[in-house]
Amino acid sequence: MAKNLWAYRGCLLGMAVGDAMGYTVDSKSMDQIRENYGPNGLLGYDLMNGFAEITSYTQLAAFTANGLLLGITRGQMQGHMAPLIRYVEHAQREWAVSQRPWGRPGITHCWLLQEKEMCRRRCMDTWMLDTLSRTPLGTLEEGVNNYMTPASITAAVGVALFYDRENMDLREICRLGAESVALTHGSPYAFLPGALLTDIILRCLIKSMVSLEKRIEDALAAFASQFGREFAQADKVISLVRQAMTLARREDLDPVDAMETLRCENGAEVLAGAVYACLTCDGDFDSAMITAVNHSGRSSAVGSIAGAILGAILGAKALPEFYLECLEPSMLLIELADDLVQGCPMEMGSKLFDDDWDRKYLHGGK
């Protein structure tokens, strides 16, 4: 099945829009948001220097995808490669370097490190930088800590966009989504939502008449089958997402009240909040963004995930132009999305040579 270019672009751009919009009000109370922006809350970007600024949520997803493309390129061009999680780990460590004013190594491998728009110091949880400077990082079996914040959940978006249906196993890629979060977050309430989000994004990338609610139900069933016995916390993750789906069916409920009920603080709650925002918007991206960021929780995280899900369904062409025209890294994200759709065009022994791909994924953009 051919990949839908506009869905891939929409996923990355939508994620960045939600990230940038939520950044302004992240972790502020709803009372503070209303005090600053009026009774209806934040209704669009609060621009800084004319640009909508992204944070580590978009950066981490992009670097994760960069690392995976680096890995598959080495595999095809050199005939051998490490497990995929090693490339995610390497990319996340390089991203962490970009967030510090010191210590950048002379040799780097992610081409995004050469792009200043993707390296601005906007890490939403700075303790991650300390975690990423240590060895070893976490696994599903041995957590590096017990953190459950949503700081690295968007790594799962990069994993989902990397998936190749013809050559990869769905369960393995969902597990990779969890593993990518577990590198820095040891709580199952952080990394299990990474697996579920990976599956939801994958289902949304497929052009289909199936409703979003049905896609989420199918993802929940697959998630329960894969992780339900291994992790007792899987039931709680499922329960939170189902609570969001139940709240979405209530037409008498104010969206702010629903989001406050869901709290939107840890990884599982943030995913639930994003699901609620997407299910109640009736396909209106602007409406979903307003719901996703106006609450007392992690607005940038919820906005990022809601934007990724809805952007994958609607496609880049359906995203409002006023969101994209001042979005700082939009052209870079389009370039990365196109690379994810294309995949490595070269193989070992082939006469085909792509200079741009070689520069980005074998020589770190240099």
Positions of PLM-derived features:
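Structured, active/binding-site neighborhoods that engage oxygen-rich ligands
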Residues: M1-K366
